[in-house]
Regions:
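Segments adjacent to and within acyl-thioester-processing domains across lipid
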Residues: 1-4, 127-137
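Beta-strand elements of well-folded, non-transmembrane domains
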Residues: 34-36, 107, 121, 133-135
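Hydrophobic beta-strand-centered segment that forms part of the acyl-chain substrate-binding groove
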Residues: 64-102, 126-130
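Catalytic strand-loop segment that frames the active site of acyl-thioester-processing enzymes
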Residues: 11-51
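Hydrophobic beta-sheet segments that form the core/acyl-binding groove
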Residues: 19, 86-122
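Intrinsic-disorder/low-complexity, polar/charged segments enriched in Ser/Thr/Lys/Arg/Asp/Glu/Gln
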Residues: 14, 25-29, 98-100, 112-114, ...
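Compact, glycine-rich, soluble single-domain proteins
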Residues: 43-66, 81
Length: 137
């Protein structure tokens, strides 16, 4: 399954490189290979390049959207990022690192869903957050 088959974002806002696993309406796992050519690194100095934290949250949001839009009844709907609770950033991400984002949906009622997401890099946790999604009816 291709990322572009499920989420409407395109370059430069499509941040997921590959969908690793998906259980429709339950969970999704995706990968992102962080390269030096990413748009968010262009204004940073060569020695201090780290991925900005809102981009990490957007990776989690896009992974959660994959879990939602893989459900036949929601395929093709618009999903909006409704909010963040309890985001906990553990470490920085630098160019050359491979991220694995995992989001598990915890509640889904009508057009509102919540989930818990975690991004890891080489086995260490980078960020975890509770997310809210709102689907357009």
């Amino acid at each position: 399954m291709e990322v572009t088959d499920l989420i409407p974002q395109r370059f430069p806002l499509q941040l997921l490189d590959r969908i690793v696993a998906v259980q429709p309406g339950v969970s999704a796992t995706a990968e992102k290979l962080v390269t030096i050519n990413e748009w968010f690194f262009q204004s940073q100095t060569l020695t201090g390049r780290t991925m900005i934290r809102p981009v990490l949250l957007e990776i989690l949001a896009q992974t959660g959207v994959v879990a939602l839009l893989s459900m036949p009844e929601h395929h093709g709907n618009n999903v909006f990022f409704g909010g963040i609770r309890q985001a906990d950033f553990k470490t920085d991400v630098r160019p050359g690192e491979r991220l694995e984002a995992m989001v598990t949906l915890t509640k889904l009622r009508r057009q509102i869903g919540t989930g818990h997401g975690v991004i890891t890099c080489a086995g260490r946790e980078v960020v975890s957050a509770d997310l809210t999604f709102v689907m357009q009816a």
